[in-house]
């Protein structure tokens, strides 16, 4: 069951920007649906400190720092079945705040 519009509006009022992430299994048999708040400075700082020593743990913590829906127990079970999903979801959260932004350098 997905959150209703009232719950989404409450999260927006509390956290500001709220994002929906969806994905499907390769065969299309299952759809994954998440709601996240935008990662803040504290979550990014924690991520930056952890990523050099344990990238998977850093991604995992970034996801759980920002997760609004579904509940954490459900996502933990999912990540136990598919541990790499924490990296995929965490990468999407990084895009939201610009840590994966591509820049081009040109000598002048």
What residues fall within each predicted segment?
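Intrinsic disorder/low-complexity signal
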Residues: 5, 16-19, 64, 101
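Low-complexity intrinsically disordered segments
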Residues: 2-12
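Short, surface-exposed, charged amphipathic helix/loop patches that serve as local interaction elements
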Residues: 27-108
């Amino acid at each position: 069951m997905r959150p209703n519009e009232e719950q989404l509006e409450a999260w927006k009022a509390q956290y500001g920007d709220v994002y929906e992430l969806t994905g499907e299994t390769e065969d299309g048999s299952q759809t994954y649906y998440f709601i996240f708040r935008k990662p803040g400075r504290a979550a990014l700082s924690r991520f930056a400190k952890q990523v050099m020593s344990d990238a998977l743990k850093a991604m995992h913590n970034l996801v759980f720092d920002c997760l609004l829906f579904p509940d954490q127990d459900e996502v933990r079970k999912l990540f136990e079945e598919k541990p790499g999903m924490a990296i995929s979801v965490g990468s999407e959260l990084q895009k939201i705040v610009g840590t994966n932004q591509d820049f081009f350098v040109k000598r002048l």
